[in-house]
Amino acid sequence: MSYYREPTYLISFMFRRILVPIDGSASSLKALDIALDFAKRYGSKLTALVVNDKTINVEEVSGEVSSRARKSGIEVVLKIKDVRNPNESVVSKVLEEISEGSYDLVILGARGRTLSEDLLIGSTALSIIINSPVSCLVVR
């Protein structure tokens, strides 16, 4: 196996627009950090999506996203979507944004804020991965 010091330009062409769903959990913030690194190395455009399902503090999560983006020197578009009725879910809002935004990659945390540490992947992440029309990178 050989190691290349030159950047791989294939990644910069494949993953130009990246979506990062954020719920404030440790794994979603880790996903944001990885996405920021992608943007720094490959020039990707980042969008952070916070879905307000009334269980998270949107202002706190938005502030954390802005703080990390500012520290890294990368511009991040922050979108907030609300779950307005019982027929909508976090998953449906994320998938809706993927379709509307023409993203190339979704980087998401494996587990949300409420799941047991015994689980390797949460139901929301799994549903997004299964139904996403684009590539997904799952961060543990």
What are these regions (language model features)?
Residues 1-4, 98-140:
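Gly/Ser-rich helix-loop-strand patches that form or flank binding pockets
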Residues 3-9, 72-106, 114-115:
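Structural beta-alpha unit
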Residues 8-77:
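Small/aliphatic-rich secondary-structure junction motif
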Residues 10, 37, 97-98, 129:
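Structural motif
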Residues 30-33, 59-61, 89-92, 119-123:
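Generic recognition of short, well-ordered alpha-helical segments
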Residues 48, 78-82, 138:
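A structural preference for short, hydrophobic beta-strand core positions in alpha/beta folds
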Residues 64-68, 72, 97, 127, ...:
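Alpha-helical structural signal in soluble globular domains
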